[in-house]
């Protein structure tokens, strides 16, 4: 069993399976299925100590409300987190049902299953804060490892190393989709999945099947009232993440280097109507230089001082956001600029 759990694969070690014409192949990013499945089987609450008897509450927010209503001093209480997990077999059953639901909804004839492994290249990028370091303190669902092992054993899932799972499933979806009369669909909830711009692809995300067939892509506003955010697809979405918005969940934020305030809504207004790739890329680098200067200095998470040109800084954040599109993909931001004949100075 430990051999199954410990075995990991680089992108170039995965067999390029050739499917019969007419096949519909689902490429699963199981990290986005397993984690929420395991998490939902944990019922969390708090136990409050400090008065005559211990009492349970759903969460700290609920208890703070009780304190306010009773004029209690919240800070004098001792609070303990508690977790009650459902039996692990329920996790297995929910996971199996979820997979079957995808297969039925999309009429799949074949499936490939992948999990994230170790040695993610982004972990060593010289960012001000280490990539995804905030997740080290996050409590993992009780049955997470058990469900991962179940997927590896029962579904012959493969664990990917050297990159993130969402990189590899993007590669596989695009590669399989190139096969004659074969439709490959990426199954994920990851927001990065819609940034593909190199070839045609399909992504099934939160009940919606996206057909990606535009290099430039688009941007739009999601949400209502004050709770709105910019979303999109293609290059517009990728560059929005890489050079402007970043990702607070993954701990990379280009705005930490901005010399002036500039937000995603301003960016959206500036680029939403641009209709060709070279013009969009030229505007992007001009705006980035305006925001960070021609060079920048900062201390990375290891304590080392970084003195970088705007392009070197852009390359770091490009590496954070860019999802690989082919095996042994070494595409840089500069490669993209040269490909589209965009002029720039360093």
What is each PLM-predicted segment?
Residues 2-15, 78, 108, 133-345:
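Extended two-metal-dependent nuclease catalytic cores across DNA- and RNA-processing enzymes
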Residues 3-12, 16-182, 198-211:
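Noncatalytic, basic helical substrate-engagement surface that gates or grips nucleic-acid strands
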């Amino acid at each position: 069993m430990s051999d199954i759990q410990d075995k990991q694969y680089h992108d170039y070690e995965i067999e390029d399976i050739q499917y019969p014409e007419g096949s519909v192949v689902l490429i699963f990013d199981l990290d986005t299925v397993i984690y929420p499945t395991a998490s939902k089987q944990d019922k969390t609450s708090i136990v409050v100590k400090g008065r005559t008897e211990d009492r349970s509450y759903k969460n700290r927010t609920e208890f703070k409300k009780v304190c306010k209503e009773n004029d209690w001093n919240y800070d004098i209480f001792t609070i303990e987190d508690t977790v009650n997990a459902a039996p692990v077999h329920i996790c297995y059953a929910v996971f199996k049902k979820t997979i079957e639901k995808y297969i039925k909804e999309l009429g799949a004839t074949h499936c490939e299953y992948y999990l994230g492994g170790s040695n993610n290249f982004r972990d060593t990028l010289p960012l001000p804060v280490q990539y995804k370091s905030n997740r080290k303190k996050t409590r993992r669902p009780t049955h997470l490892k058990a469900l991962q092992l179940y997927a590896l054993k029962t579904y012959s899932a493969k664990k990917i190393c050297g990159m993130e799972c969402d990189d590899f499933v993007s590669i596989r979806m695009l590669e399989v989709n190139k096969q004659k009369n074969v439709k490959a669909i990426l199954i994920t909830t990851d927001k990065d999945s819609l940034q593909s711009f190199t070839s045609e692809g399909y992504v099934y995300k939160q009940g919606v099947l996206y057909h990606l067939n535009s290099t430039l892509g688009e941007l739009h506003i999601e949400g209502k009232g004050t709770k709105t955010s910019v979303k999109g697809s293609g290059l517009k979405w990728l560059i929005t993440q890489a050079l402007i918005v970043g990702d607070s969940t993954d701990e990379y934020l280009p705005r930490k280097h901005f010399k002036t305030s500039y937000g995603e809504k301003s960016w959206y207004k500036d680029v939403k109507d641009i209709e060709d790739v070279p013009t969009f890329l030229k505007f992007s680098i001009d705006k980035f230089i305006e925001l960070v200067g021609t060079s920048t200095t900062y201390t990375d998470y290891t304590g080392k001082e970084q003195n970088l040109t705007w392009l070197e800084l852009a390359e770091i954040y490009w590496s954070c956001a860019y999802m690989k599109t082919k095996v042994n993909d070494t595409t840089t931001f500069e490669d993209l600029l040269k490909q589209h004949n965009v002029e720039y100075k360093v």
